[in-house]
Amino acid sequence: YITVGTGIGGGAVFREQAIHGRSHPEMGHLLPPRHRLDADYAGCCPYHGSCVEGLASGPSIMARWGKPLSDLPDEHPAHEIIAWYLGHLASTILAVLSPECIVFGGGVMATPGLIDRVRAQALRVAGDYLISSGGNRTTIEEPRLGSVAGLEGALLLAQRAAVRRELV
């Protein structure tokens, strides 16, 4: 799951277990190639400037264009630029984790048409080599629960933790 909002973060699950190393994943801090129309923007991440979070998060969009992505006209270059960065993030996740599915959620992803642009960009970057390998296709989707996905997930995790404590 990748959330795109005030920041960009993500997590991965394998066999119903979260994947992490010594710390939590920092998927939003991957460094993508720069979009040709966005070369002069330094980014807003205080650590890396031009990481995915620094280039495609809500605050980054506001800093460049003064409006949320969803308020900009469909033909505005911001849509292509943001999809570029998120598509590169998706293709990196595909190369490293080879997941069945990548779910993109969060406030920025509520922009109409953005998920389709991200899918198209990921396909351009990763090609059929990563998107469809041996007949197994990775899908790029929106959360099935929409804007309440984060809350529902938190409640489910709390419920599971409570049940485990009762069993111990």
Each language-model region and where it sits:
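Glycine-rich phosphate-binding loop of actin/hexokinase-like ATP-binding domains
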Residues: Y1-L55
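ATP-binding/phosphotransfer module of carbohydrate and carboxylate kinases, centering on a glycine-rich
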Residues: R34-V168
